[in-house]
Amino acid sequence: MSSVTGSGITSGFIDLATYDNLERAMYGGSDATTYFVKEHYPVGWFTKLPSLAAKMSGNPAFGQQFSVGVPRSGDYILNAWLVLKTPEVELLAANQLGENGTIRWTKNPMHNIVESVTLSFNDISAQSFNTAYLDAWSEYTMPEAKRIGYYNMIGNTSDLINPAPATGQDGARVLPAKNLVLPLPFFFSRDSGLALPVVSLPYNEIRITVKLRAIQDLLILQHNTTGAISPIVASDLAGGLPDTVEANVYMTVALITGDERQAMSSTVRDMVVEQVQVAPVHMVNPRNAATFHTDMRFSHAVKALMFMVQNVTHPSVGSNYTCVTPVVGAGNTVLEPALAVDPVKSASLVYENTTRLPDMGVEYYSLVEPWYYATSIPVSTGHHLYSYALSMQDPHPSGSTNYGRLTNASLNVTLSAEATTAAAGGGGDNSGYTTAQKYALIVLAINHNIIRIMNGSMGFPIL
């Protein structure tokens, strides 16, 4: 490895001598900021630690809901996550499908175990999200470096979502009991500047309510040669249908100095937060019509629209946004048949009688929009995005449209030829559409809103 001699360093001054009008415009003159002196911004001293949310009410059981109180042990809440232990599941030899029966959890187990989550202040909902939002949000915002770790957290692993044959069959195994973790994507969890100031809210009871799905809508009992799916019953499983689960909500609390605490408690503050809105779900049948529209009666400043056509043929097969139902593949794996493609062909956005977006092919919403305006392009089929914001995952406003000032805004979706074929049913064994496939159009909106913190309480000054 050679070193730069003194004459070589001297030649570097030639580069500096090329400074001209272009460089003056780009770099500035004598008042420009240097690259080599870092400015230090003193900030308030703090520390953080995990805390268990207590004051649980309700029953953490499948098909039930429970709520927990946000801990008052800290000054701010930085984030929250749900920890849930799945039960051990063993398929009996005497199950409905006999020696051909297999059992597995649905895709994205924690997304589907949790039907909805709501953050409330004195019973006023501040933010709520459901399974579809968890599916979509993770597809658009998950950095690739974290994806495998996230799958491990939510149970998207082979030991849970790959088919397990019945007792006595080759490859027979149990679905293990396992601790799963779901990071809850509340508005306060992505930016420390939006941390929830619980010390400023002594007059608000802050609670998180979690609704869990029934176990019958989470476990898939499927024939390993035909692909037929049967609703699971208690006699299929050793010990019957699992009921109660171990579930806890944890949060990271931040502790600040007394000076900052005193200043914070006496200051009126407006926070720009995010909320999730869900349009009424529409059942769509491409055999009746090729194009369907849904009215989007949203409110507030909408920054992004996310839409999917979900395959709802079997309630236990969740997070499926393709034309057909997955089947059991070689080696007891999950196989997506040939028609497991996007049910959407194209879509357009209309404001009253004005076309806001022309009929654009599905690649615009599933590839182009995420490429430019989201962190990630979805790895799963069937997710579509239109972002008004320059960065849909950034909590700082960078573009939106006030849907409260619009009337008759609608999304028009044209379904694909493959969806029409699958909707007719009649496919062969393991085609994924031996029975007629059913679809539902789901539309989600992410909007900005203002929370005002004043006199020890929170409220929404702009309804």
Curated annotation (Swiss-Prot):
Name under which the protein is recorded: Major capsid protein
Family per record: Belongs to the NCLDV major capsid protein family.
Keyword Signal carried by entry: no
Subcellular location(s) of the protein: Virion
Domain of life: Viruses
Function of the molecule: Major capsid protein that self assembles to form an icosahedral capsid. Represents around 50% of the total virion protein mass.
UniProt keyword Transcription regulation, yes or no: no
SUPFAM superfamilies in the record: Group II dsDNA viruses VP
Gene3D superfamilies, sorted: Adenovirus Type 2 Hexon, domain 4, Major capsid protein Vp54
GO cellular component annotations of the record: viral capsid
Main subcellular location: virion
Gene source species: Rana tigrina ranavirus
Keywords attached to this entry: Capsid protein, Late protein, Virion
Annotated gene: MCP
Subunit annotation: Homotrimer.
A Pfam family this chain is assigned to: Capsid_N
